[in-house]
Amino acid sequence: MSNAQPHFAPSHLQNGTPNSVHSGVNRPTTEHWAEQRTRSADSTKRRTRKSATGQQHSEPRTARTTSRGQYVDFGGQNLKVITPTLFINYSFLTKLYLNANKLTYLHQAIGQLRNLTHLDLSLNNLHSLPPEIGMLVNLKQLLVFDNQLTDLPEELGSLYQLELLGIEGNPIPDDIKQIMMEQGTVELIKHFRETAAGPEAPPERDWIVLDEITDPAQETVTALSYNILCDKYCTQSQYGYTPSSALAWETRRELILGELKQRNADIVCLQEIDQDSFNEYFREKLAHYDYKGVFWPKSRARTMAEREAKLVDGCAIFYKNSKYVLLDKQLIDFANTAINRPDMKGEHDIFNRVMPRDDIGVVAFLENRATGSRFIVGNVHVFWNPAFTDVKLVQVAILMEGISKFATKWSKFPPCKDKVVYRFTNGDDEDGKEADTTQEPGPSKEYGAGADIPVILCGDFNSMPSSGVYDLITQGTIAHSHQDLGSRKYGNFTRDGISHPFSLKSSYSAIGEMTFTNYVPHFQGVLDYIWYSTNTLQVVGLLGDIDKEYLRRVPGFPNYHFPSDHVALYAQYIVKGRKEKKVSEVDFGPSRDRERR
């Protein structure tokens, strides 16, 4: 058996490619190309040894688990086709060997194997690789030695963790081969990433109508929530699959502004917006589209010098100035609130787990200038770490407790005395036209209790629909023994349970939630929500999911079309009618006398 000959002629590779493909590059051998030749020769030797022992006709190995992961070896089976079922049903695989077969085509479903770290396609008859190969961002080794590849897809640029791309033995264009020879795999992948045109722009997201608005006089309100990915967090090391030009803040902020202008929501809640971007860019730019805003940075900014503090991200609420007047605004500092609660004094979990987090919530109290309806608008960014479900729950409990206290206070707020819009020089739109303020101001509405005031609560809650955070907000209560709290001690929260007085619902629950709101290679799921009070508002329209066909070749965001790793949520509501009497006497101030003259 040791003297057995390989089952293909020595002068030709198994796929019929002459050995001259290996030796015909008339250049000095470099370190990188020497590695290509060595690894290619190793691959051929392994196949030859298996041929000599008759292993090429053995049954294909089923999925096996080793200390390094799960793998399937279909090498040397003379396979001409691989069914897509393998890729779809075995998405858990970390290694896949399809080398030394007779494959001429690789199905696009290969993109389903997003856990792969090692893929060997050597010694086949492949003439091309599908663009979906770029979805395999966990790949460390991609071996395509000794095929018939005449080019490589630009989507390989997404494979930022790739350590070895084995291309020797293919009629690859000289410019690509030159980069590999002189600079190696890492630089070739970078070349693809930085020069790729990227995917075609996706279709516009569908607008989903849940209920028709039949009365043109019906009061409506639209809200948009968006984690815009702070510039400080948007690094090449974190988002290595994205071209550097698409990560640049100057590029991303223009895309973000473009979406905000396109949606034209009455209320906009942004998370991960830093102080500098709020003051120097968004506040000024959005003022041209009738927006005013409030902002607070995360609590660590208080201890920093001004130059560092302006780079700290936080939460901002923008609102249409011609439609709403700001009655009050409040900051909810979770850590500071927690350590100052009498029932939590001495609780070690507060000091060890909650206090070190600087996450915040921002709450605004608005009034519709024309109808007198009032709104509580909350915007929050909850702690991110999946291992701290208890901290997330405590933060949201403090948020809801704070909103409840503010709501009680605001239910007793006096009527707004002057709701005529004041116009500023930067309040005109880009064409120099003034905002439309034709509606006459109406009397302020009264609310008997805080829970009667319409609530819109936006944010990145970093919590899935199966979480305790979701349960608390939608059900209004959770038990002190909830699994997300574990065995931690958080004062009354873990003694008596947690509750709030509002009747809240996720806007997107009407369609079973979004497919995802956060889209990165290692996670695609729902973390962001717009909640609304069902006793005062009815959701009638939603901005739908991103096109699935587009996503088939996009391993993660951000990219040239989506400037954040989160997507914007956008919803429309009608304000339900109320029987409460309106305040009969309203003082609109000096402006009323001016109108009479």
From Swiss-Prot:
Location, primary (coarse class): cytoplasm
Ranges of compositional bias, category Polar residues: 12-28, 51-69
Coiled coil: none
Subcellular location: Cytoplasm; Nucleus
Chain segments carrying region Disordered: 1-69
Keyword Repeat: yes
Listed cofactors: Mg(2+)
GO molecular function terms attached to this record: 3'-5'-RNA exonuclease activity; metal ion binding; poly(A)-specific ribonuclease activity; RNA binding
Entry's Gene Ontology cellular component terms: CCR4-NOT core complex; nucleus; P-body
UniProt-listed Enzyme Commission number(s): 3.1.13.4
Enzyme class: hydrolase
Catalytic activity: Exonucleolytic cleavage of poly(A) to 5'-AMP
Pfam families attached to this UniProt entry: Exo_endo_phos
InterPro entries from the UniProt entry: CCR4/nocturin_mRNA_transcr, Endo/exonu/phosph_ase_sf, Endo/exonuclease/phosphatase, Leu-rich_rpt, Leu-rich_rpt_typical-subtyp, LRR_dom_sf
Annotated Gene3D superfamilies: Endonuclease/exonuclease/phosphatase, Ribonuclease Inhibitor
LRR repeats: 66-89, 92-113, 115-136, 138-159, 161-183
Protein family membership: Belongs to the CCR4/nocturin family.
Protein name: CCR4-Not complex 3'-5'-exoribonuclease subunit Ccr4
